[in-house]
Design a protein with these regions (language model features):
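Non-transmembrane alpha-helical segments in soluble domains
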Residues: 1, 34-41, 239
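A glycine-rich helix N-cap at a beta->alpha junction
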Residues: 2-25
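Glycine/small-residue-rich interface belts in oligomeric ring/scaffold proteins
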Residues: 4-7, 172, 234
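A conserved beta-strand/loop capping segment in the N-terminal third of enzymes
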Residues: 8-13, 29-37
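Conserved short loop/turn motifs at secondary-structure junctions
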Residues: 20-29, 155-157
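Hydrophobic (often cysteine-bearing) scaffold residues that line and stabilize catalytic clefts
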Residues: 33, 163, 234
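Active-site cores that bind ATP or allylic diphosphates and position pyrophosphate for catalysis
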Residues: 39-215, 224-225
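A conserved active-site cap/scaffold subdomain adjacent to cofactor or substrate pockets
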Residues: 217-240
Length: 240
């Protein structure tokens, strides 16, 4: 929280100050998510999947061999009844819970910057909501937490634009009102193409560096807010 405080942001609710919507740390809320996932299963908005990693990988490779984008084929939705799923779970068989994305129609959302965005449902995958270890995936936990915490506005990077239609399908399946979205572009920087492992420049056939424009990221050695403070930069300048 130190970085947020340094920017001058002050919050009246959270892990360090408490409030009516706690707990605020996801691992302390882990018992909530399976309950909501099973609510979706009962409503038909999700289903239990017993496919092994090997089966999924074989299907993925088969799709790649055909030049197709892999999507889970809903095999467990069509072949495993809810009663059978509950028996197999009671017997200790590993499983995940997947979102049951419609195969027809549109999924859409409204963004304050990009306006109305919609995609064909048949292009979306049945993403995992609850993993085999019982923990929620990031996307599912976000939807549940935002609803329970009465979040009115969701502001995040454009890398989450492609996830928003599936978020709204979850809101619809639950019968919840979705938040107002604002997807903002990341901070970009002029750089050169580098190797992901060594972080060294990748040269072209003439031995020259290859200029690119990329997202500012610590993964590539760019300084963080705290790094800049330690180097003596004033926070007022960084905030600009």
């Amino acid at each position: 929280y130190n970085t947020l405080r340094e920017t001058g942001l002050v919050w009246d609710e959270g892990p360090d100050v408490g409030g009516e919507y706690g707990p605020y740390i996801q691992t302390q809320r882990r018992d909530l998510y399976p309950k909501f996932a099973w609510e979706l299963v009962e409503k038909g908005g999700a289903y239990c999947c017993f496919c092994t990693k090997e089966e999924i990988e074989a299907d993925r490779k088969a799709a790649e061999a055909k030049g197709e984008t892999y999507k889970y084929n809903k095999k467990c939705l069509h072949n495993v009844s809810l009663e059978e799923a509950k028996r197999r779970i009671a017997a200790g068989e590993p499983y995940v819970i997947r979102q049951n994305v419609p195969t027809t129609g549109k999924a859409s959302f409204d963004d304050m910057l990009y306006g109305h965005v919609e995609v064909d449902c048949d292009t979306l995958d049945d993403n995992v909501l609850i993993k085999a270890d019982g923990l929620p995936t990031y996307n599912f936990a976000n939807v549940v937490d935002d609803h329970l915490m009465a979040i009115s506005h969701v502001m995040r990077g454009t890398e989450y634009l492609s996830s928003a239609p599936k978020y709204n399908l979850l809101y619809e399946a639950f019968g919840w009102k979705p938040p107002i979205y604002l997807h903002l572009p990341p901070v970009m920087i002029e750089s050169v193409l580098k190797d992901k492992e060594t972080k060294q420049p990748i040269l072209d056939e003439n031995g020259n560096e290859q200029p690119i424009v990329r997202k500012l990221s610590k993964r590539w050695g760019d300084p963080s807010f705290e790094d800049l403070l330690q180097k003596g930069y004033l926070k007022e300048i960084i905030n600009l």
